[in-house]
From Swiss-Prot:
Assembly: Homotetramer. Interacts with protein M2-1; the interaction between the two tetramers is required for the anti-termination and elongation transcriptional activities of protein M2-1. Interacts with host phosphatase PP1; this interaction recruits PP1 to the inclusion bodies. Formation of a complex PP1/M2-1/P allows P to target host PP1 phosphatase to the M2-1 substrate. Interacts (via C-terminus) with the nucleoprotein N (via N-terminus); the phosphorylated phosphoprotein P binds to N-RNA complex. Interacts (via N-terminus) with the monomeric RNA-free nucleoprotein N.
PTM annotation, UniProt: Constitutively phosphorylated by host. Phosphorylation at S-116, S-117, S-119, S-232 and S-237 is required for transcription inhibition by M2-2 and viral particle egress. Phosphorylation at S-232 and S-237 increases the affinity of the binding to the nucleoprotein.
Region (Binding to protein M2-1): 90-110
Pfam families: Pneumo_phosprot
Protein name as annotated: Phosphoprotein
Broad class of the protein's primary localization: virion
Gene Ontology biological process terms in this record: symbiont-mediated suppression of host NF-kappaB cascade
Function statement: Plays critical roles in regulating RNA replication and transcription through its interactions with multiple proteins. Tethers the RNA-directed RNA polymerase L to the nucleoprotein-RNA complex. Recruits the M2-1 protein, a processivity factor that is required for efficient transcription of viral RNA. Acts as a chaperone for neo-synthesized nucleoprotein by forming an N-P complex that preserves N in a monomeric and RNA-free state and prevents the association of nascent N with host cell RNAs. Recruits the host phosphatase PP1 to inclusion bodies to regulate viral transcription.
Length: 241
């Protein structure tokens, strides 16, 4: 027959429980120092008790924002306009006969104060494509002349025989280029004058023609009469067209 633990009921069970709690009271006494205060950290609604000996620490890292450079328009440097053609070599030696010519040419072709004589409409008009192309060719030829002058400046520092030969050849080419540029400029001016005359003529015609009537050719007149009379005898034949 199996043995079971004794059962206690009523006052007897209460006395037994009291004696058991008094017997184990000294075994689980707290060893914490009463002077040290504990802190309670609540994490996700769960209370965690942390003593002062806990290695849990907290710190804050302060990041200093870097000061950006002042980029106001007043502090920005104004860079000068670069010339159309520039060279790295020193082109102004005192004993060079072509340095003055080269300098004057650069100043003539790279004057910031000069503006184009063509208006915005003339430059962007589709009918002026040929004129724009001519101006582009003139610009290219002017750049070639600057290159020739630069070659003259560099060649002037070489031997006498080579210098004289290059000088004669380059001077001749320069004269030819100048003549071609003059011819292109004259043709461009003539074309602009012709366009101006046509524009003035059209403006005069539009100013004189103030009526709303449109002239009709013979076929249009027959069609108009047919619609006005509404007569079947005035039908048009293929010969009328």
């Amino acid at each position: 027959m199996e043995k079971f633990a004794p059962e206690f009921h009523g006052e007897d069970a209460n006395n037994k429980a009291t004696k058991f709690l008094e017997s184990i009271k000294g075994k689980f006494a707290s060893s914490k120092d009463p002077k040290k205060k504990d802190s309670i950290i609540s994490v996700n609604s769960i209370d965690i008790e942390v003593t002062k000996e806990s290695p849990i620490t907290s710190g804050t890292n302060i990041i200093n924002p870097t000061s950006e450079a002042d980029s106001t328009p007043e502090t920005k440097a104004n860079y000068p306009r670069k010339p159309l053609v520039s060279f790295k070599e020193d082109l102004t030696p005192s004993d060079n006969p072509f340095s003055k010519l080269y300098k004057e040419t650069i100043e003539t072709f790279d004057n910031n104060e000069e503006e184009s004589s063509y208006s915005y409409e003339e430059i962007n008009d589709q009918t002026n494509d040929n004129i724009t192309a001519r101006l582009d060719r003139i610009d290219e030829k002017l750049s070639e002349i600057l290159g020739m002058l630069h070659t003259l400046v560099v060649a002037s520092a070489g031997p006498t025989s080579a210098r004289d030969g290059i000088r004669d050849a380059m001077v001749g080419l320069r004269e030819e280029m100048i003549e071609k540029i003059r011819a292109e400029a004259l043709m461009t001016n003539d074309r602009l004058e012709a366009m101006a005359r046509l524009r003035n003529e059209e403006s005069e015609k539009m100013a004189k023609d103030t009526s709303d009537e449109v002239p009709l050719n013979p076929t249009s007149k027959k069609l108009s009469d047919l619609l006005e009379d509404n007569d079947s005898d005035n039908d048009l034949s293929l010969d009328d067209f």
